[in-house]
Amino acid sequence: MGKETQTPKKGIARLLEIAAIKKPLVITSAVLSALASVASFIPYIAIYNIISQILAAYPSFSALDTAYLIRLGWLTLDGILLNIALYFAALICSHLAAFGTLYKLKVDFASHLARVPLGFHIMIGSGKLRKIMDENIEKIEGFIAHQLPDIVASLVAPIVMLAILMVVDWRLGLAALVGIAVAIVIQVRAYGNDGAKKMMDEYQNALEDMNNAAVEYVRGITVVKAFGQSVYSLRRMYDAIKAYTKMVIPYTLSWENYMSAFTTIVNNIYLFLVPVGILIAATTGDYAGFASRFIFYLIFVPSIATVLMKIMYVTSNGMQISGGVERMDEILAEPE
């Protein structure tokens, strides 16, 4: 029985496979990033308790337990410092892993290029190879060093955030979740369709063609200047620039509505809370308790925007880097 052919991994799965070259450092970075994400919510819990204590004692502030409030204040500061320390440690580990991975990938890629037939270099073009070596592989370093800890944080943060939203007051939590759901639907429509993937592939192809043409143009610049020619004389360079322009402008404009809608919603989730808050206030018998919870949600929902924006940027960068990795793998798959 022959061995089964293993399907090559693509996308995030392939990026994680590459990151596994320095597995211990990557795992350590992921754990520290997850802990940092949890620690980032400690100040919100402490502030909620401070607000609750103050409103419960109103108007007799002399009854406040000042020692307890001071401890909560220190807990807020400790949460901030712990988040910074853990995230800094996570970045140190991820950068060490990234530099080691980058070195290995570049050495392997250069060694492979030295062994492939000469005709392959003529067919592909040095501009495309230079882009893969200098840009695509460099972006993998950026993914491991920065995006990977952010991916872990963007997975852990929504879980902690959801728990807080539902535990403090499930009614206000559901109102906030409606806003989050609308934002996620917009994000999925923007990233999670075949059109977005196809457009990203076309963008990468146009960029590589322009790189190839630019390298050839620079190499032939002495001849061009000697005979008083312009860029129009090098038809391939001119066509590559026009093709890139024709592709990148619609690509940019395609994000006009999605990005505007997503940014507007994630930065104004509190608007979903206000109507629900008015309805609850009209029927509640514990105004102090409700006021403390409502104020907490108004303070807390801006953190939702931070989490969702981080998820959006991680997704966007992941698509670009994945496309670059696929091109690197295509070169590495060439027979020597």
What are these regions (language model features)?
Residues I21, L25-A36, P149-E202, V276-R293, ...:
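Transmembrane helices of ABC transporter permease
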Residues I54-S62, I164-V178, A261-V325:
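Helix-loop-helix
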Residues P24-N49, R71-T76, L91-S94, E141-V156, ...:
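Alpha-helical segments in transporter systems
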Residues P43-I47, G79-S126, R130, D134, ...:
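Juxtamembrane helix-loop junctions of ABC transporter transmembrane domains
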Residues H95-S111, V152-A153, A176-T222, Q229, ...:
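Cytoplasmic coupling helices
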